[in-house]
């Protein structure tokens, strides 16, 4: 850990301490090391090194060098200036400033933060102090944690004493080394706090001075305002941490009386109510408990002396803040009075205890009059987070708080540990006050009652109410502490509750309800509070009757009374204003403020109990004596304040927390009736229900709703509360399945007054969100209101199940009967999803969404993750994501259905105003700043917000609509990607990229593994980059820019001195992750989450190196970083016993666990690595870089050489062939047997995976099962036993689908890896420089590696076998079988050759076996055919050639050749007709490639069979069993018969002409033949081979060879008149050459057939020549040059023949040469036939003899 810099070491220590604080103890050894390294830092606290003139001067001296630790640094002028600036800014030693700046530069803070170096130094300085103090605080917290192991707690206690307080462990103490330093810690801590306050004051003074100069326009605004704001916030946090440490020191008994007195003296001089004062209140409470309470360490005498010091009064007790002094005295007296309640006071002789008691009572009451409770209440309230504070609670506080100014409104939230410690001490204060001062509390109540009676119109003291509110703050959110009020009914606290609830005044009742609400923060406490309010609730054992206590009955009576009162005072209906229903000219002051507050507290208490306690909720809903809902709804339409109406809505919301369907329908009925006719059932109305009227007209239900919405839309409280009520009503009831197959309201809702559904409510929410939020001035209220609206929108979106539409059309389930809604059409029409989506295309709504997201970065930086600001941004982003996901469903399925229904039913709903966009993306395109905002928010440290931002960026970056708008337009030059341009402004892209780099490089917590925030953020970043690159890999995107590339119009570059050039880009961060990542551990094996991380990074790099846009840049950079060798070093071999997240691959649960996903990712990552190595090897071979090429081959052969060191041994390329294990039968997973689900149609949940084929959507499958189960439940067979069996089958089916999916993915990943491995091996085979024996050894090693697997897969797994056979084929063709003589063979090469011969024969047998089984695809069998052909022609024939040479004509070689050939023929014979049958079938019934390969193999088989003749016997005369077999199979007859269509097949246009190809062709064949012509050539070659044997010629002629040729018309057509298809682009000269080539092949077949059988077929040969005399004569003339020049005619025809092909002069010459060669070959073939048949002699005998002419010319 010594290589960590100071801040990074503190951060590492902090992370380990946080883990222990969370009871995770995996890193204790690391923690111990880190803790030991910080010992000196703990002892120094945050003391700053003093300024030193020598150090300052040393920075300016030449040479400018500085030594820090053991390192010496050379300094430039800019660095020195930054050092001096930092030292001046922080009043810090110059050398320490240099150390901080060096750390900043080393850690890349300038790039990460996009700030000047000195500002980064300021931030690092404060971070170091903050982390140091936080670590000290955490150590003290752990030492006080009683929930951890006692031994561990003791160890941390010893560490705290030693390293923080300077007290050595007991075993190290001696008399000379007594803990004297402990006496200095508290003063040092106080001094440090004073220093923090001084720094902050200095900053404030500078800011004020600068503001004055700015106002006078003398200076410009600061550029480093964000840094200053961070410094201020950090200083406040440091002060808070110091206060917490000081608090722990006091609690651990390290304080003295002198320390306490000094502390009180400091408080007496404190003149401002601010954050720093609140930080000290827990310390004050700890001091009081320590020295003034019987629970502390002080004795009574000591406490009495301190009592005189604190409560002495007079001028000596003057306080700059009198209310603070009053609070100190009150707190002290409450605690100190505990000394006088037990027997110890009997030792105080001569003291009048009663007089002292009266004096303390008087002092306490005087303190209250001076504002003690007021101050404590302010501290308790201000310490709580204000952002979520309910306005009602704030109103109660403002009503009681009168003497304390408000806390400065600065963004300095109090930490959770300060809040906790303060509330714990407030709990102690409350307990002490109730237990030690009961008479004082009674006196307070008596005095307040007397004041209310004697002076009802004057302001009364409300200290008792303040005390109750203090209790509420102290216990709010702490249900375990609140149980002390409920556990023991005879306790002081329980007695206080009963006493406070009796005969309470209106203000006291309000405060009591608020206190009771805060004492009900969980179900147990809330139920206890509910029982307390029941008339029959438990009471203290006989001490007090509850007859006059606060009960539910009293609360209900009060509500009924005020409802009647408020509604009876409502003006007459004709005078009511239609604009404000029920409140025409109303003044909220018509209800007394105290009464309104009491009603608010009643309602808040009801809402709390209903929320927390199901018993209370049921009682409130089902109470037969009091209809709560009816009463409060009547109250809501009266003349009441907005805040009271909001409380009513919160009660209704609470009643629906754990609602049932029936309760939900009833609530909707109440709300709908109340909205459409609010005054119909109010008390006081006589006869029929009345409606308000306007200008003599009675408004209808819709007008009433509009008026109510206008009323609720004003202000924050009631609109926010009403929207939250609507949201709760839309949340599905608990206990429902996850189908969301019903609308969240009664389907009949609105049927009598408007269109069905809740469209008016949706419109109201969006109206508030888009329009009325502009009227909210308070930022906190605006955020909360927006969040409430967005929560409503989100619920409407997520509760719509789009899959039901698909399942309804594709599955065999009767979905209308199965789903909860009436039918699918009703569900689609009524669900609020359609209306919400319609609103989301509104311009104002999208603008409000963008405004919600776009916030001040400074405010965001200081906001907590659960603040309204952060949560509202998060929800807005989530809404946008959901809208993009569901947009297609809405546009193509839902909206057409809604419009169709409206057209059929004649219903027309109110259109959405300003629905300007046809797609949601159009709104995003109008706000490009959104991309920048989303990128910036990724660096705030809020994990959920970061994940959402990255997800939305991914959606935006992959949207085809947005991509088409952002991408360059080919019609306009210079139009770059708009998003890239936006990110380039002000360097925003570099800032975002740096923040993403920091997130990528953040350390992972091994204990949290995949659940850690850092890990999830890393994956989100990688997924975003991958999706963006994959969408447009060949165009510059924002992903390229963020990775560090310089994006131009259509290409990428590297900016000089930019992040990429300096290797500080996000791309290099990804590289660093891969290079440093270790995915395996000795004990746990492969860590799945790390494997996944590695694969996600690799696939991004894979896209980059494959894309032409970025390939060259990326390949060069990867080569420069030795990426290839790092990957091979980190690669782990796959072993059967290697665990994957604790699971073995052979385990039965492997495919059901997430370990299988890690295994799949590992295979994919290795495939990517092999792909890269193959690409790199090709690159270095083509670019001729032999040194790197040699290094790569060494690495692939198992050795990496590093400089002059010994080579590192790693697995070789053949060792990495470890992923193929034939024992794993993943593809043979049997299907389970089902009884009830056997006919289930899973077609709708089948997805076509890009690589894995059929893939099941598990979520859709679960939905299908849920629908099927509901279908069963509706039937009569749905017994419990039946449903249990169905549920069991469902579980089995889901598991089987999961296993099937993962097995397919695994097999696909394995196949992809095999392809990559095979491709890499082929590249190695092609590019290696091996010669002779090393080459043979390498090829043998490769052959040995693949043969066992190929043998296992040859007939079972065609895809895997194809890849291996491909390698085997290349290996076979690469083997050099030509040997000049045995004398040139050394012993080693001879041995290798023998081994290869054995392996090749094994390969040959394997292929024969697979062929005979007709295994695999035609492509695979064509490979088998090629391998067999190569073996026969190269191995067997070559051996025969070697044996025939004189130098090798010894007995040994001849015998081996005979054995080899015999062994080969024996193997062929072993498979018999079965083998030949498959080959013959493929020769005619497969694709062209396989046909050709089969024909070629048959040719080789015939040739090999012929070559086995005995010595001295002509091969033509030997019987060939292969030929007999072919004849038995009727193959020869079919072969000959196929010649009838040979001319059409040969001339069929199968490809276009490419002149460039001719340059690579041989002169004899300038144009490559098409696959069909290749097949025809192979077929003719086989015929020729057959006809060269007497046996074969017989079978061919018997098959009517001449008749087939006659019918084909090949020899009957004049080659010069053959038509050429102009569309084929083949020049005529080329077409002629091809035609003549066909004639040559057929003529040779005829000649061989005639000559092979001697005189038997002469007649047929003569007849053939006679029939085609014209062609024969024409060819012979052509060949002799008679009748015109061949070249000239051909050139003219090729130029003027209408061909569209363009040929160069060289191409023309080559084509003419080929044509002439074909003509010459055809002439030779005819002459051979003429000679063999004696055709000329025969002809001469048939005509009369003539006198010979002179100069007779003979044609040859």
Curated annotation (Swiss-Prot):
Gene this protein is translated from: NUP192
Role this protein plays: Functions as a component of the nuclear pore complex (NPC). NPC components, collectively referred to as nucleoporins (NUPs), can play the role of both NPC structural components and of docking or interaction partners for transiently associated nuclear transport factors. NUP192 is located to the NPC core at the nuclear membrane and is essential for de novo assembly of NPCs.
Single GO term (MF): structural constituent of nuclear pore
Top-level division of the source organism's lineage: Eukaryota
Major localisation: nucleus
Entry keywords, A to Z: mRNA transport, Nuclear pore complex, Nucleus, Protein transport, Translocation, Transport
PANTHER family in the cross-refs: NUCLEAR PORE COMPLEX PROTEIN NUP205
Protein name stated in the entry: Nucleoporin NUP192
One Pfam family here: Nup192
InterPro entries: Nup186/Nup192/Nup205
Subcellular location as annotated: Nucleus, Nuclear pore complex
One Gene Ontology CC term in the entry: nuclear pore inner ring
Subunit note: Component of the nuclear pore complex (NPC). NPC constitutes the exclusive means of nucleocytoplasmic transport. NPCs allow the passive diffusion of ions and small molecules and the active, nuclear transport receptor-mediated bidirectional transport of macromolecules such as proteins, RNAs, ribonucleoparticles (RNPs), and ribosomal subunits across the nuclear envelope. Due to its 8-fold rotational symmetry, all subunits are present with 8 copies or multiples thereof. Part of a tetrameric NUP192-NUP170-NIC96-NUP53 module.
Family in the record: Belongs to the NUP186/NUP192/NUP205 family.
GO biological process terms, semicolon-separated: mRNA transport; nuclear pore organization; protein transport
